């Protein structure tokens, strides 16, 4: 598997900025908005890293995104991977989504605008996972051919 170190550095910086924004949360709506959006971004990135961990564990063939500015980390090679690898990569994304929803539910201050915004963004991301990613994984699980999922290639 190719190196994803530059994405790890990028996402670590985003995470640290997010923590700082929550630690220095002021009374303004802007500071709450920034903190909430950054937490939502971290949730999205956590979901993507969940997929990548699944790819690593299953030894799936993936190709890193061409730019550090890409929100997606990689392309899963639909021609080189088997059904089990595809499903493993899908499942670990679902697990990551469940984990960030758990953390958001139990650890964010949901009484604050920042907490509510982060939760709404997280629920929106989870809905995208349920309505877009889950049906594809389900059809592959039921025996359909792995669809072409590459975006960058």
Task: Please name every model-derived segment.
Residues 24-44:
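Short pre-active-site segment immediately N-terminal to the catalytic Zn-binding motif
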